Amino acid sequence: KFMNEFGEMGQAPFILRGDFPLDRVADFIGLLDDRPQLSKVFLDFGCGRLLAGLEDLSDGDWARLCQKIDQHDGHGRLVKGPDGFRKRNVVFGTPRPEWKVMHRIKAAMDPDNIFAPGCLPGKV
């Protein structure tokens, strides 16, 4: 049964991965309203990880979801989404100051941006 439900989540057009402190993940789930509509949610209270299939996600919904994740000291990433959505939005959640360090390392190691262009946070 678990594999069937996990497979159903994989069919959703959007998949969110969230990582939270153990004492914040339940509060985060409690604050979610019906936007965006979740198809399946898997929680691992042992490590604070959430995987959620989303049937629809507007740019505004994503921005609000990122705010809620930040308010609960979490990190969110959209691991699956349509190409158009991924081009318009940063799928790694709210930009963070430490991304600049990753960008400098990437620029030093790959000055021609050959390896995995656009795959680091901040579309680098």
Where are these regions (language model features)?
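Conserved glycine-rich FAD pyrophosphate-binding loop
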Residues: 1-124
